[in-house]
UniProtKB/Swiss-Prot annotation:
It is an enzyme of class 6 (ligase). Belongs to the class-I aminoacyl-tRNA synthetase family. GO terms for molecular function: arginine-tRNA ligase activity; ATP binding. Its main location: cytoplasm. It is found in: Cytoplasm. A motif ('HIGH' region) lies at residues 137-147. This is Arginine--tRNA ligase. Gene3D superfamilies: Arginyl tRNA synthetase N-terminal domain, HUPs, Isoleucyl-tRNA Synthetase, Domain 1. It catalyses: tRNA(Arg) + L-arginine + ATP = L-arginyl-tRNA(Arg) + AMP + diphosphate.
């Protein structure tokens, strides 16, 4: 109900100005206009909205809040635009003004959304380019469960921002540069030289094993260390043999990553660390020009303001090592500079969002401060870190295999689909239903992957969460199967003869369950705006779960297909809008829906 809320806010402000003209004029002069403090009602019995601004005026006006609220209400009642929108306001408690939208206006809002693909969610008036940096696996390493959160949280946020009308650049900042390639190329030259000049000579699993061997040699063998560093210098210098080997390794990993992305329906533009190599010297020059660089023990650093180590001294962000090499902070600064830079030499972004684990919070806080002090973040632009917690096993410890290894993402997704298939076959057997193998595979694949995505997204991303196949695949509770089944239930209404597409005349509602569903449906636009601002997909999940519950109560307690001729069209309209809203909301989470389960 964002449109109604905006209209009410303007009407309340005008009423306050008329009720207290002197105070309003003084407030405007101080650039602090009177605020009605309009918010959704905390409980259904309080109406639709609640205005709490009278309490804040009590001290400056030296009047009781209820007296102030009474004066504001009198002005509202004298405004025909307000009385056309709301029933008579009620003053509650110390001076809260409770507002209830007229039923016919709520019904009109539902009617408007029935013909609106955006379901009442307005596109932003001034779309600003947004960069969302997410997923970001490392070359020559398999994607593991830790990449799941960044990938699906980042994808969901990108979908919401795109839906709101922002041009979004989805970036995959893969780890495709650095010492690890010197190690790996040196090792492969000795044990599997074909992998360095022949495509697909080894698969990603082999590369991972070779990487572990190379890392052990690098840690234990000084001669191997020296050769590896020489290989890095060759790579940085553009040696054609080294570059070809590097390119083949990247391509092999890229193909494996893409299989995961295709499976999860993730769209990404790869732009690895290597992309920013040409811009690293300019970062140093820019920091020098801004007089931020300090030489400390041979390294070039920027000391942070307001951040001290255990010794009480300011912590440094090292941007160039004593040997002249660069590090992650330098690359991240180059990326920030490029992303905010004007086109065609930059992305021209006005909001840059990094979706990584919470363990990198201090790193990004330091890098962001350096970029801000260097003047690389345009005025009014936003640079944000979206941190997330760990994926834990049901024992509360970091999720591992029985052998103690990191869980491969591919294996986790396979198991989710296998378990969904087992559950489906068991249910079909209990119901004595016969379905084609194609149907079973499609439903199991959809439900399994949806369950994994939703279980993650429904948690507050800032906290750790416990991974449980049993919980996420359950048909009850705040799960993907529960929501998918709500959509299936509505599709069943159409199959049983309810035409969800035809609506003639005005909508009419009389039952409390109908009005509860109407009000829940009309919250969708506010929830999307909240996710766009707060970058918390779990708010959307909570809304969809509540909507499903409200719909199920409506459907269980109010006749739909057996309703009388007068009530039937309006109830079918509620079913249709519920299905559309669930499909749209789940789509923004990257979850497709089903007509049958």
């Amino acid at each position: 109900m964002l449109r109604i809320a905006h209209r009410l806010d303007l009407q309340l402000r005008a009423a306050m100005d008329r009720a207290f003209p002197e105070q309003a004029a003084a407030a405007r002069q101080a650039s602090q206009p009177l605020d009605p403090q309009l918010a959704p009602a905390s409980k259904p019995e309080f109406g639709d909205f609640q205005a709490n601004g009278a309490l804040a005026l009590a001290k400056p006006l030296k009047q009781a809040p209820r007296q102030i609220a009474t004066a504001i209400v009198a002005q509202l009642q004298a405004d025909p635009a307000f009385t056309d929108l709301c029933l008579e306001p009620q003053i509650a408690g110390p001076g809260f003004i409770n507002l209830t939208v007229r039923p016919e206006r709520l019904a009109a809002e539902v009617s408007a959304r029935l013909g609106d693909q955006r379901l009442g969610v307005p596109a932003v008036e001034q779309a600003a380019p947004v960069v969302v940096d997410f997923s970001s696996p490392n070359i020559a390493k398999e994607m593991h469960v830790g990449h799941l959160r960044s990938t699906i949280i980042g994808d969901s946020l990108a979908r919401v921002l795109e839906f709101r009308g922002h041009p979004v650049l989805r970036l995959n900042h893969v780890g495709d540069w650095g010492t690890q390639f010197g190690m790996l190329i040196t090792h492969l030259k000795q044990v599997a030289p074909d992998a360095l000049d022949t495509a697909d000579a080894v698969d990603l699993g082999d590369l991972v094993a070779f990487y572990r061997e190379a890392k052990k040699r690098f840690d234990d063998d000084e001669a191997f260390q020296t050769t590896s560093r020489e290989e890095v210098v060759k790579l940085q210098g553009g040696d054609p043999v080294s570059l070809k080997a590097w390119g083949l390794l990247c391509d092999q990993s890229r193909r494996e990553f893409q299989k995961i992305y295709d499976r999860l329906d993730i769209r990404l533009n790869e732009r690895g660390e290597s992309f920013y190599n040409p811009f690293l010297p300019a970062v140093i020059d820019g920091l020098k020009d801004a007089e931020l660089l300090v030489t400390d023990d041979g390294a070039q650093c920027v000391f942070l303001e307001g951040v001290q180590g255990k010794d009480g001294k300011p912590l440094p962000v090292i941007v160039q090592k004593s040997d002249g090499g660069f590090n992650y902070a330098t690359t991240d600064l180059a990326a920030i500079r490029y992303r905010f830079g004007a086109a065609p030499d930059g992305d021209d972004a006005r909001r840059v969002i990094y979706v990584t684990d919470a363990g990198q919070a201090n790193h990004f806080a330091g890098v962001f401060q350096v970029a801000q002090r260097a003047g690389w973040i345009p005025e009014g632009a936003r640079l944000e870190h979206v941190p997330f917690g760990l994926v834990q096993g049901e024992d509360g410890k970091k999720l591992k295999t029985r052998a103690g290894d990191t869980v491969r993402l591919r294996d986790l997704l396979d198991e989710a689909v296998e378990r969904a298939e087992t559950d489906l076959r068991s249910r079909l057997n209990e119901e004595e239903r016969s379905e084609s193998e194609e149907f079973i595979q499609h439903v199991a694949g959809t439900v399994g992957l949806a369950a994994v995505k939703y279980a993650d997204l429904s948690q507050n991303r800032i906290t750790n969460y416990q991974f449980s196949f049993d919980r996420m695949l359950a048909l009850q509770g705040n799960t993907a199967p529960y929501l998918l089944y709500a959509v299936v239930r509505i599709a069943g209404i159409a199959r049983k003869g309810g035409d969800l597409e035809v609506l003639t005349g005005q909508l009419q509602f009389s039952e409390p369950q109908e009005w509860a569903l109407v009000r829940e449906l009309l919250k969708f636009d506010a929830v999307i705006a909240e996710v766009e601002e707060e970058l918390l997909p779990n708010r959307l999940c909570s809304y969809l779960f509540e909507l499903s519950q409200v719909f199920n109560r409506f459907y269980d307690q109010v006749p739909v297909l057996k309703a009388d001729a007068e009530a039937l069209p309006s109830r079918l309209a509620l079913c249709r809008l519920t299905a559309d809203t669930l499909k749209s909301g789940l789509g923004l989470l990257g979850i497709p829906t089903l007509d049958r389960m």
